[in-house]
Amino acid sequence: MSISFQQIYPIHIDAAWFTQPFQGFCLDSRKIEVGQIFIALSSYSQPEKNRQFAQNALNAGALAVISETSLGLANEWVCPEVRFLMGEWQQQYLQAVDPVQPLRGIAVTGTNGKTTISRLIAELISSQAKGCAVMGTTGNGILPNLTPSTHTTLDALQLQQALHDYAKQGANFVALEASSHGLEQGRLNGCDLEIAVYSNL
């Protein structure tokens, strides 16, 4: 099934690409695929390269660029809140093109104890013969099969893709670590959480 960005975010943008089918979102200009929308988050460590990364994505076939600040490019839409909206966009896109039963989410946050608590929750749910994924410092996946994780909380696009994949693989629940950094950056935006656990001050 094809879908346009307008169907995901129904506002008026005076640009042809807005109503054209697209092939998903991407944050890394080196991994862009033809027809995807490139999300250009501002790089504070390499601000001079922001425009070049976005231009590289367009050169590689990106349908458009959504940026936090204006980069002066063709097919660019400036959305200062993109960092906090992209998780919801990704969730809606994946559900539109490949519907699944959403996972029932349990998020654990706090200074200490996130890894232990999320793992215990996942083990407990799994013991009741219900598929449970776990995401955090010790790895991501459906117990007992975990793969190493580069971050406690994945970026919003990766997180939604992982949740979608786990649902397709038969999981019913997910217990995930919600780092303060991840929460501040909106990485969990788009997650439908049923329970939030706060371990300590």
Where are these regions (language model features)?
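Phosphate-binding loop of NTP-binding sites
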Residues: 87-201
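N-terminal leader/targeting and accessory segments in enzymes
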Residues: 1-92
